[in-house]
């Protein structure tokens, strides 16, 4: 994201455009003064550094054309229009893609599979704006509104709003559904060749039961990452669709702000558009854990980072302790030997703290050398604590 924002910053500011314009010589002087106050006359690298400094201080910067408005108010005021078109089209497109992908995979080699494959190739190849232009022509035949009605329009009417939503949403649905159909169909074909599908059929399960309980889930799991790319693709297609159908959304703001060199507005738009797929990928990872039992099993049987660090620390402590031991400061005791039994009778061994508590007389009785600080009992290294009195 940082690299993308850096490239966009320098590209936008290399156009020579300014966000303010003048209609007279008097206005020109005022505009020059204001541009100087905004720092437009500073070197580009200085403005770049100032932008990041402002951003990390918690400010999105100034909207030059109207300093009284904040950047977040402008963008988030248009977000509902964008999310409505993008998310609805993505939901419908992915649902249709899964359905047609399942049908195409289950009936591979049949006429319906061939027809679906032709349509998939067609709609994947044709850009969304070309589909949109074709739908604009069709809108007149079905008496559908050619322009989108935004949420903040003065003449907003829910019935007309739904009718005006059909064409923009369909423009994005075709590509999304085609992409999902292609991926799901390939996964279905691969799953159908697995041994557990043959086993399910040999048990007498119907085709519907096999498809629903075995093929469907195992085909969808590998297709989950496609949801992230699908959302990114829907946002990318939204740039042209919003311009084509008059959707006052985030993409439309981005286009206008680039043309007027509203750098701060452009950068926040890029952050927002880049952030949506990022959040979607995090959400998809969480979904993966729910739908894929292999991940749950691996997580349950795996070792956390904290546990790994704990093991490393304990191992290093164990090595340090053994480095201090030599033949002069340690005494070997074999399991079930007379010495071991005597220690058990004395209840001198503390396995919890890896210590042995003995008096000087007990050490003499057990024939433990006075210089010994440790007792080696099997794989245990027990520190000797001398009890006085």
UniProtKB/Swiss-Prot annotation:
Alphabetized Gene3D superfamilies for the sequence: MetI-like
Entry superkingdom: Bacteria
Entry annotated with the keyword Cell membrane: yes
Segments passing through the bilayer: 1-21, 83-103, 115-135, 161-181, 220-240, 270-290
InterPro entries in alphabetical order: MetI-like (IPR000515), MetI-like_sf (IPR035906)
Any single GO CC term annotated in Swiss-Prot or TrEMBL for this entry: plasma membrane
GO-annotated biological processes: peptide transport; protein transport; transmembrane transport
Membrane topology value: Multi-pass membrane protein
Family matches, as CDD domains: TM_PBP2
Subcellular localization, as worded in the UniProt entry: Cell membrane
Key words of the record: Cell membrane, Membrane, Peptide transport, Protein transport, Transmembrane, Transmembrane helix, Transport
Domain (ABC transmembrane type-1): residue spans on this chain: 79-289
Family: Belongs to the binding-protein-dependent transport system permease family. OppBC subfamily.
Job of this protein: Part of the ABC transporter complex OppABCDF involved in the uptake of oligopeptides. Probably responsible for the translocation of the substrate across the membrane.
PANTHER family, A to Z: INNER MEMBRANE ABC TRANSPORTER (PTHR30465), OLIGOPEPTIDE TRANSPORT SYSTEM PERMEASE PROTEIN APPB (PTHR30465:SF0)
Name the UniProt record assigns to this protein: Oligopeptide transport system permease protein OppB
